[in-house]
Amino acid sequence: MRNHLGGGSRALVVLVFTISAAVTGWNMQARAATPTPGAARYRVSMTADDTGTIWQGRESVTFSNTGAWPLDHVWFRLWANGHGRCADPAITITDTVGGAWADPVVGCTAVRVDLSHALQPGSDATVSFRFTLQVPKRDGRFGNADGVSLLGNALPILAVHDGAGWHLDPYVGFADSFYSLASSFRVTVDTPNALDVAATGGQVQRSTANGRTIRTFMARHVRDFALAASSFSRVSRVVDGVPVRVWYAPNVIAATTARWVDRLAARSLTTFQKAFGAYPARELDVVLTRLPNEGGMEYPGIVFVSPSFDAVAHEVAHQWWYASVGNDEYGAPWLDESFATWSQTLPFDPWTRCDRYDWPSSSVRLTDGVDYFRRHPYQYGVIYSGGGCMLANLAGRFGLGRFETMLRGYAHDHRNGVTDGSSFRAAVIRAGARYLPGFDARAFWRRWRVT
């Protein structure tokens, strides 16, 4: 996500946001370190009204207990309710099969499902339900503005249980609260012919009849599924075997803007593949929109972004840092935002020197979670500028080529998995031993407030 980065500068303008009421954590006592439920297979069919703002459908999720103990329940995240919360929910669930649904909690963004029977380790279960989704009239990753419907974090997905318990963190408008495991999606989208659809995954089927178009998208090893619907125009090309498409509403975005974004996305893709390894998705869809503060939002294989140089490169970089190398975005937001911030400089002028960072307070740490930044929102830019500065410092110490070699190995080791701070620190320590004899990792982490 990019919502704090200034135009062409590496200094970030930190905005003060209104914070919604804090909601206490709901984590269970940890019983297993292995994340579960895993190997989820989502099957979704959804139908849009004429405007693309009301969707009805059915979702079926088959998942495995990848933990060491039986599961008698799971949790689903209903992130579509994040903005309106319980007072104005955007998604409603009915006709559930495979478990009993409790009342939603955490601002109606989390719901417990008691399974029909205890799920033993290594066994599978299936839960299905009908849903109605109302896309709100607003700018944002989930909203409709200027005739463009963005469905980011809209479909219900499984919450994660790991060594910290169930992750049931609250929705935060200025940050990301999302944490999910790599899964597969098969999503069939039924729309009026007038609506085009850009989505996660590849389109594998398409048919048209009676004024409507039915498209089926498939994606494997992805953490979520997002789509955009509108009467789009598009610019497309193939980059190193990867289809790249830039989607735009011509009444909102000029064709000349879409063309330079196409060139920028292509350059970013080529640069990042050389630096971090093969692009992790089948294709890249860039949906241009007018998100607030020249911002953007990343999803597997698709990004929603305002047309700015920094934002486009930043969101494409997230295809490696979060979409492929996953992390708990609420508990450790620096693990994707710092990396995307540093990476966004590579297509233009690689950031390889940053010897000093002006911390906004003595208490903030680069490794703080969103819980801290909800109390101190003006310090949230630390995970962008502070983390980017730290990585630039490492790039300068190691040399850019060696640093990229380290990052390629790190990305390979955690591809389609979940990383944490200790994994990155270990990668740096190994690289330091190889490239910088005498590198004092402990002093380095203290200096950059990595705990």
Where do the protein language model's features map onto the residues?
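Catalytic zinc-binding patch centered on the HExxH motif and its immediate surroundings
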Residues: 260, 274-281, 288-310
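A surface-exposed beta-strand-loop module
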Residues: 83-148, 211
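Solvent-exposed beta-hairpin/edge-strand motifs
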Residues: 71-99, 152-155, 190, 194-195
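Amphipathic alpha-helical substructures
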Residues: 54, 67, 380-451
